[in-house]
């Protein structure tokens, strides 16, 4: 890809050495995860450097500015759109960014997170949270807009893994899809 070529050219011109490659491991778009993983694995294999996958939902958590959040007890709930009224989500501790529940593909309805919201404040964010805002109605539910899993938020998480030697085997790493790929039916005559 042209962007990768430009980035590597810039690194050569600046005299930068690549020590590892970090990537968002999912959940997320099937195609996006496949393309990103293929590029990252190719770079790691070709340059004989480590691969560092980072949980996409954790990257979303790292992007929340601390000044937007209270100092009292609450949880972070990143949400990635998984089509219709479904989201990829999990709960995270606000200080450590450690996952406190399993990552799931959750269909959102009026009862979603009702038990958790009865016990604590939850901050929802990510591209899946917007569609949930009118469905999840509770005084302890707060929504933060315009939060994306950008590389600049992944960098500190990846650096920590790098320093701790937390690498994946390049040959066997697969992204975290969470759901099986279901191709849409073709609308092109002759491919049906």
Report the location of each language-model feature.
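N-terminal beta-alpha supersecondary unit
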Residues: 1-27
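DPxDG-like acidic metal-binding loop motif
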Residues: 20-56
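Stable alpha-helical structural segments in soluble proteins, enriched in small hydrophobic residues
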Residues: 7-11, 46, 64, 154-162
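Short helix-terminating capping/connector loops at secondary-structure junctions
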Residues: 13-17, 70-73, 168
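Surface "functional belts" at beta-alpha junctions
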Residues: 50-149, 177, 182-183, 187
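Short amphipathic alpha-helical face segments that pack within enzyme cores
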Residues: 2-3, 38, 59, 153-157
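Residues at secondary-structure transition points
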Residues: 2, 30, 34, 38, ...
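Acyltransferase
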Residues: 144-192
